[in-house]
From Swiss-Prot:
It is found in: Cell membrane. It is a single-pass membrane protein. GO terms for cellular component: plasma membrane. Keywords: Cell membrane, Exopolysaccharide synthesis, Membrane, Plasmid, Transferase, Transmembrane, Transmembrane helix. Pathway: Glycan metabolism; exopolysaccharide biosynthesis. This is Exopolysaccharide production protein ExoY. Needed for the addition of the first sugar (galactose) to the isoprenoid carrier. May function as a sugar transferase. Belongs to the bacterial sugar transferase family. PANTHER family: COLANIC BIOSYNTHESIS UDP-GLUCOSE LIPID CARRIER TRANSFERASE, UNDECAPRENYL-PHOSPHATE GALACTOSE PHOSPHOTRANSFERASE. One of its GO terms (biological process) is polysaccharide biosynthetic process.
């Protein structure tokens, strides 16, 4: 019996009965992930609580936001973030696109907007400092994500990977990665795909450590974040 959350006709669906590929890094990478995630949650718990309060009291809405992403072997999971957008964000975005065709083209090609009308005041600060992604430490502990790896994508984005999608699917999506330390939104999507492919093809635990350490100045300087 197939165990998956998507239709068998989906291009990136990999049924478990075919012998799904184990994620890169094996037990050493998984042990590294769990250790770092637990230590980070403990160390950052005061900041975690502070952000929760800021998000809640800024507009009274929900604290967390979960969006379906494609994970290892094509299985979907709910990627967690602190909510940075208005609760009626989808409607706001569609109205914005009607009068801003250039913004729609930016969204269509990059899945990002430099001036996103949905983002709240508190949310813009959280995004700039990448604090909105802290809840993904819980995704890591649950085994849905890794500390280092390709950033989680939606199905439409994975189609942009074309033949390189197979490399994305070999790894758990990461909290950080080559893309984050190399300019993030300042680089093209094709370059992002190339980074992800290179990472998976050349994975090592040492490389993960280097990326983690390089993430700290990248986040502090807000390189390519918006």
């Amino acid at each position: 019996m197939k165990s998956a959350t998507r239709s068998a006709t989906t291009a990136f669906f990999i049924p478990q009965e075919t012998g799904a590929i184990r994620p890169i890094g094996g037990i050493s990478k998984r042990s590294f992930d769990v250790l770092i995630a637990i230590l980070a949650l403990i160390a950052l718990s005061p900041l975690f609580l502070l952000v929760m309060g800021l998000v809640k009291f800024s507009d009274g809405g929900s604290i967390f936001y979960g969006h379906r992403r494609i994970g290892h072997n094509g299985q979907t999971f709910k990627c967690l973030k602190f909510r940075t957008m208005m609760e009626n964000g989808d409607r706001v975005l569609q109205e914005f696109f009607k009068s801003n065709p250039a913004a729609y083209e930016e969204w269509r090609t990059t899945r990002k907007l430099q001036d996103d009308p949905r983002v709240t005041v508190v949310g813009s600060v959280l995004r700039k400092l990448s604090l909105d992604e802290l809840p993904q430490l819980l995704n890591i502990i649950r085994g849905e994500m890794s500390i280092v790896g390709p950033r989680p994508v939606v199905e439409d984005e994975l189609e942009l990977y074309d033949s390189a999608a197979e490399f994305y699917l070999r790894s758990r999506p990461g909290l950080t990665g080559l893309w984050q330390i190399s300019g993030r939104n300042d680089v093209s999507y094709a370059t992002r795909v190339a980074f992800d492919t290179h990472y998976v093809q050349n994975w090592s635990l040492l490389a993960d450590l280097v990326i983690v350490f390089k993430t700290i100045p990248a986040v502090c300087l807000s390189r390519g974040s918006y």
